[in-house]
Amino acid sequence: LLAMAEAGPLSDLEQARLELVRARLVSATSRGGDAPLLLLRAAQQLEGIDISLARATYLDAVAAAIYAGRLASPGASTMEVARVAAAAPPPPNRPRPPDLLLDGLTALFTRGYTAALPLLRQAVAAAEESTSADEEPHWLWLACVMASHVWDDERWELLSRRYIQLVRQLGALSELPLALDRRIRPLLFAGELTAAAALLDETRTVEDA
């Protein structure tokens, strides 16, 4: 399908969206390696075309770099991706939860925890606001992680529950292991060992399928 799309004449927006699809495909199938760099390049292409989509893609790039860790390609470490993403244009309208997460995460990796803490708290609080079912899986797991980092146990519980419910509703099987992991952690922290064990068993079943 990508090859067919490339065969025809493409506008700048269509070309940028094609690169984004390619980058997200690599991210979904490899969870590391080239994904952060491809997403970063796609975000840069989108900057002059669609700022909201560019910022969402920068957030995807930061998330991919976090996930990839040492497996990220040269030039796409979490610090390097965050530094580029921090220079992204501001959102064109009122900042949405993914915008606030992007600002908080880039501050965390470029300026440190103390500078990022107010931004991360704001992002976690805003994450209670629903956006779109298609968009939320891209950032909701990060909101769960950040809720634990800022010691917001109530929202950690709420967001992890919403994340796994959303993934189940969408039938997004590729996202289910990550959603289960995000849900297991607050359950363990709260001492709900039986519920956590049940989800761990489900994780094994999904991964073996």
Task: Annotate each predicted stretch with a short phrase.
Residues 1-28, 34-46, 57-60, 73-77, ...:
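Repeat-based scaffolding regions
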